[in-house]
Swiss-Prot record:
It comes from the Eukaryota. Keywords: Coiled coil, Phosphoprotein. SUPFAM superfamilies: PX domain, RUN domain-like. Residues 656-779 form the PX domain. This is Sorting nexin-29. It comes from Homo sapiens. One of its GO terms (molecular function) is phosphatidylinositol binding. InterPro entries: PX_dom, PX_dom_sf, Run_dom, Run_dom_sf, RUN_SNX29, SNX29_PX. Belongs to the sorting nexin family. The keyword Coiled coil applies. Residues 269-299, 346-378, 778-813 are annotated as: Disordered.
Amino acid sequence: MSGSQNNDKRQFLLERLLDAVKQCQIRFGGRKEIASDSDSRVTCLCAQFEAVLQHGLKRSRGLALTAAAIKQAAGFASKTETEPVFWYYVKEVLNKHELQRFYSLRHIASDVGRGRAWLRCALNEHSLERYLHMLLADRCRLSTFYEDWSFVMDEERSSMLPTMAAGLNSILFAINIDNKDLNGQSKFAPTVSDLLKESTQNVTSLLKESTQGVSSLFREITASSAVSILIKPEQETDPLPVVSRNVSADAKCKKERKKKKKVTNIISFDDEEDEQNSGDVFKKTPGAGESSEDNSDRSSVNIMSAFESPFGPNSNGSQSSNSWKIDSLSLNGEFGYQKLDVKSIDDEDVDENEDDVYGNSSGRKHRGHSESPEKPLEGNTCLSQMHSWAPLKVLHNDSDILFPVSGVGSYSPADAPLGSLENGTGPEDHVLPDPGLRYSVEASSPGHGSPLSSLLPSASVPESMTISELRQATVAMMNRKDELEEENRSLRNLLDGEMEHSAALRQEVDTLKRKVAEQEERQGMKVQALARENEVLKVQLKKYVGAVQMLKREGQTAEVPNLWSVDGEVTVAEQKPGEIAEELASSYERKLIEVAEMHGELIEFNERLHRALVAKEALVSQMRQELIDLRGPVPGDLSQTSEDQSLSDFEISNRALINVWIPSVFLRGKAANAFHVYQVYIRIKDDEWNIYRRYTEFRSLHHKLQNKYPQVRAYNFPPKKAIGNKDAKFVEERRKQLQNYLRSVMNKVIQMVPEFAASPKKETLIQLMPFFVDITPPGEPVNSRPKAASRFPKLSRGQPRETRNVEPQSGDL
């Protein structure tokens, strides 16, 4: 793998880990919810940390690899234990108690599981950051366990691991560490297919190291894989017979089978050291492609004789799919023969029928290979014709038993030599004498040569996937995951946009609701005003009607004396009822019209008065502000002026004529010691003078007034600023604040000292507040101050401030 590929791999691992950490922080960060391993985000986070710590582990681990190989040879460990795991490095930094804790877990039986349990325990206890600092601290120890191109050896990227672990401290993890699933792919009692599959993998690894051609390697792997895959761990038919070397060994094996049914040992064929101990040699001449197997005790049984056995119906009546054939062999030594040293393996699938099987198979000769397919037998003539035999695999154990394998599919590398298989280096290597004899297995099918994949059972398809297919499936799955993540991001962006749009719509709806509520309130107030006005009109109408009726009654009583005649008789003027009603209606109508006209005039007059009042108030406010700008503040300024107009007029008419301004600011001193001086202009009636003060003097005045008048604390005094206090904008803002502060202080003095308010004088003000003492600035003549009348006309806002003299005098604003 090139350097760029290693760099891309490390960057890919870093991005995946960052994404997993981010997803966990988004889901569980800042919440009280517990993050358990049932959540896919937590599982993904653990998997990414494992991938980072697993990346670039060295294959050779010294004592650790040797111990794992010894455990595997002894049957205490599976094949996967020989793969390097990050637990070998992690346990170097753990203390005795921590190691004892992880080794005492009940359901953790492998180093892979212990490493995963340590990672999850560190997440639970928020100690992963500390462990990662310990793991990355010793670079020499890291180089012992990891390659130079590994992730943890990359200082730039590995330094981010403790930071990411620290970011997970806000999450409450509750991950189960004593879980048997952490051991990886669980392996129960090995079956025949498991054993043959491991031997096939060993042969494959040896063939890859040999110098044979690619075609020979491919055919050997395919042939072995087909046999190993098609072996089912549990057979539905009766168990096939097993031939023993002798009767005593056969009986001994039967007893051991009944006692130890489930004990199996997994032996690997790829370690040369183990094969030296066993003494078995598999060797083949380079030109002939013959295979021979010889045991160290030279007591193997020659069992392969020449025969042709077609696949016929077995003991259960099932039809075999393929047939097997072997070269013609004899036991008398006339022809070359194959020796097969077969070590026994306890078959857990042979159960109730084994007594009958051993009894029927003790006196027969058995043949294991066939070279060409033959016609099926019509009847069961003998046991060798009842069952179809596959090539016998050599499995080492304590007893010598041949184990038959029923062939479902086969492959023949007859045209290419089989690679040399050396499982030992001792002096007992033997070569078959006949170079022309070839070990060949031909593929055949009952039909027209259907492919091998069509004959495989569906349950064995996942086992037949090669590394390239698994890699392709993984790449496809990762591509699909990236597509889903991209789609998820786009959907999330759309969701965020819709949420923002929805929030804007909700805000707009709330604004409209407030506007509608305000309009309803105004309309309700109008309705109430109109209702009150209507009630007033009703009352006025009743009064007018009452007045009209009273006038009518008075008119009738005035006409009554004229109705008496001279002779003393009463004569009543006759008047029609209709005329009376019409007259009343017309009078009511006239009165109503008059009332309506009067009411309209009143409303119009009221509106005109209201508009005039608003205009006058605006004018008064403007003139008051201009007065403040020209003559200084009125007592209390606008905010402190009484709402009662009469009281305000009283205050204005009786206030003391004391005005204060800060018209300008000057910069004095040199560059290093430059400071600003504020010109303060005070006028009491016709007496006026200027003083020049720095900000520190204003600040000391403020502290003294706070002690004397606690109410001064509420006044807005500009704070001190150490950096940027020479800025023109800042100085102008401070000038306005100091001017308002002095005016507020002057109003407070007028309120608190009635004598000064009654007779304001310059001497009295200086006695009360020495801050206002008139000190002539250096370099100015004492009598250079002109009269106030000559300078006062310059008090206009239109006069630009930049045209003033460097030393402004009395009234110079």
